[in-house]
Amino acid sequence: FVSEIKSIHDNIVETALGNSKSFLNCVEYAIQNFDESERVYFVENDYLHLSDVENYLNDGFSVGASFVTLYDHPDKYNISQYPTLQSKIFVGEHSHWRSVPSTCMTFATHVASLIKNKDILYESCCHEVPSDWYMFEKMQSRGELLVSCMPGRCTHLERDYLTPLVD
């Protein structure tokens, strides 16, 4: 599989670091190799995307978001899990966007936001699996905005976490 991917893009780095350490490795790579204005997209290995990802990510940033996810997590529709959830709805060129308190580790942001929130990213990744909910809650307390498109443009590939309304 890696050789097939390398035939498309030659800058593939294999690691055996685990979930949190792999994410932090990518954060460090982005900070060291990209300009602060550049966007990076972190994608977990168990997500499937619809087409036109780049246009949708650009659309999410156009509504003022610091962090954009194309995953419409079904937990946001579970009143027992989020009994007081209040969201702002934004209209982009391609989608509706909703402010959400958290998402999984598949999201886009600017390198500048990684630098600004580096302490939170590291604090959230001190265990094997990142504390994504904590991470986004903490960053939003600093004024960062996380939006999710509705309907989603990607989905988690676990049956209980499929994006609603997308076949």
Segment roles from a protein language model:
Residues 1-38:
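Active-site-proximal specificity loops/subdomain of glycosyltransferases
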Residues 36-39, 64, 143-145:
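Short coil/turn segments at beta-strand junctions that form active-site/ligand-binding loops
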